[in-house]
């Protein structure tokens, strides 16, 4: 009789590999032609409220990179997004997520919703999404 341990281990490894949250999508690298804005972001979520610094870079083609931090060296969230794909990492993302924007987890949808308003060139953004409030000023 064969031991079931190695077979169970292989089956588990294959299942977990299918749960991966990394993406093979390559986001554009920020270039000198990208617009850069810095300011403050007030975030109020269901369990936490934070005010921190935000750095946003975006291209005319719609690629976006947003970094939200609470002082030097305390990165809370790094977002990358284009028209179809998005990625988020950091404590506010509960780790790391990447994939199609349309399939983003509920906890990230409000963050990814900021893209359109930032690309519109607004210097002040106030929005509510899914129990979260964002107040962004450049």
Task: Give the residues covered by each predicted segment.
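An acidic-aromatic
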Residues: 63-116
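Bacterial Sec signal peptide processing site at the extreme N-terminus
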Residues: 16-34
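Sec-dependent bacterial lipoprotein signal peptides
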Residues: 1-21
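Generic low-complexity segments that are intrinsically disordered, proline-rich and/or Lys/Arg-biased
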Residues: 4-7, 106, 127-130
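Compositionally biased, low-structure terminal segments
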Residues: 8-10, 113, 135
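Post-signal-peptide N-terminal segment of Sec-exported extracytoplasmic proteins
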Residues: 34-76, 123-134
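Non-transmembrane domains of secretory- and envelope-associated proteins
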Residues: 47-49, 87-95, 115-138
């Amino acid at each position: 009789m064969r031991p079931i341990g190695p077979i169970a281990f292989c089956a588990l490894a294959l299942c977990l590999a299918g749960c991966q949250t990394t993406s093979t999508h390559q986001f554009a690298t920020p270039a000198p032609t990208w617009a850069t804005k810095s300011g403050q972001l007030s975030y109020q979520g269901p369990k936490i409220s934070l005010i921190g610094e935000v750095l946003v870079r975006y291209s005319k083609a719609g690629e976006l990179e947003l970094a939200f931090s609470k002082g030097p060296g305390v990165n809370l969230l790094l977002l990358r997004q284009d028209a179809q794909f998005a990625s988020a990492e950091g404590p506010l993302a509960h780790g790391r997520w990447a994939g199609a924007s349309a399939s983003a987890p509920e906890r990230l949808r409000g963050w990814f919703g900021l893209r359109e308003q930032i690309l519109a060139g607004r210097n002040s953004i106030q929005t509510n999404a899914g129990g979260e409030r964002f107040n962004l000023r450049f």
